[in-house]
Curated annotation (Swiss-Prot):
Belongs to the pro/parathymosin family. Residues 1-101 are annotated as: Disordered. The modification Phosphoserine is found at S2, S5, S13. The keyword Heme does not apply. It comes from Mus musculus. InterPro entries: Pro/parathymosin. Parathymosin may mediate immune function by blocking the effect of prothymosin alpha which confers resistance to certain opportunistic infections. This is Parathymosin. The keyword Lipoprotein does not apply. The modification Phosphothreonine is found at T52.
Length: 101
């Protein structure tokens, strides 16, 4: 009878080890992805700084273009119709009493 309990314990521990290994691998994968995202953000910021430094003379012209784009975006604000609201956010559905679900 002791042989069966030893085998069961060995199987159980192997199963536990496999589950633990899977969890560790998942956690390591998440950390790696997070690290990559942080590196990408840092690299993106460095690239923007380099571009700004290289474009020294063109900097004034770019500002004027940016201001023109901003002015176009700031046009008169109008209220959306109910149809446009539904199209803009199709995930929202209204319940019978009118509240969002």
């Amino acid at each position: 009878m002791s042989e069966k309990s030893v085998e069961a314990a060995a199987e159980l521990s192997a199963k536990d080890l496999k589950e633990k290994k899977d969890k560790v691998e998942e956690k390591a994968g998440r950390k790696e992805r997070k690290k990559e995202v942080v590196e990408e953000e840092e690299n993106g910021a460095e690239e923007e700084e380099e571009e700004t430094a290289e474009d020294g003379e063109d900097d004034d012209e770019g500002d004027e273009e940016d201001e023109e784009e901003e002015e176009e975006d700031e046009g008169p604000v109008r209220k959306r119709t109910a149809e446009e609201e539904d199209e803009a956010d199709p995930k929202r559905q209204k319940t019978e009493n009118g509240a969002s679900a």
